[in-house]
């Protein structure tokens, strides 16, 4: 018997991959809240033609992890319900940052690299030259903060405006804390090996050209369609919540027991078994997969495995305010785009804003999502801000930046506590140590979810698949 803690997208995916293994008995999934889907939260307003997304809303279609997600979507019968945004779509081409008192369009082609594009004071081409002729770092580094790495290789402007704002969008994090080795491992490694990013990428590309030609796995199905149609990003009709809902239906059909509103009380490892107590009920398991945040798992392991618990608890998380705004006017935005990000150097209380109605059809509505806080949540809002306080800040920023001064016709304020892990310098080393501890002690425990190997939907689904493969192995009891 296998149990899974958490019914977010990674926990449900783990259940799906376990079901595919054909074990003698289907797994059971325990979820502490009253709903499934985790941080994926879609609120639909079918009569009005729009949706609010409190969490992720789009998925990227490129790379091995993305292909795995596309395969899963097709396998569960959602292939015909995918809603792609093509690379020539305005939401794919137009991405902005708010800096120096104005919205600035980021370059989307090579022409933007050879001319000066605000907020930068010189062409981005010169940043590449700085890296190319900058020489090697004075000492070999095991890891480095993203900001430090980019400033060292490409200059302060790129670090301040491009990378810092990008990390606000990826993980609501501070580039001066986030690990380059974890988020951009290939760039970090080629820089350390070859003494520069541009030089290293060129040399690596030349060296691998012939090797890769014979190793390319042909794309099939939805992944092949995504490439041939040149998707930039995609969602699913009805909002991203459709994916966990569909996974639940598949698991229900496979007689997987999904229990919500339950409390995990104790985890104890005995030999090669796991003793799990949930709502006073004792279960003896062959294996346990945890998809809950690392700090929550740490509480249950502290008594028996304090060293492991300490490392799990050391992974930091941040709070994010997400404010959905809907206006009954489709023509409020002067610039059509995916949205904009705000670099921390601007010292504003928001991380950015997504133009949902530019990405997907919201009928005769302008729909925006304002994100705020993250690594700076307490600095701006204190410990316990009210929803009214966050709404007021969001509306003020929308007014100042987008010149929208009317009240929204509907809105939703979400205060998401400890929702995004921060992959600080040394994160990869910590995660490697956590997994090594589990192997060294032969614990029948698998880990998946955003705490460890990536925050995106693709990352957590792949982490579920890898975890299932690792914990099941040859033992199919």
Regions found by a protein language model. Name each.
Residues 1-29:
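N-terminal Rossmann-like FAD-binding beta1-loop-alpha1 element of flavoenzymes
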Residues 21, 260-383, 388, 397-401:
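Mid-domain catalytic core of redox enzymes
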Residues 19-46:
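Glycine-rich FAD pyrophosphate-binding loop
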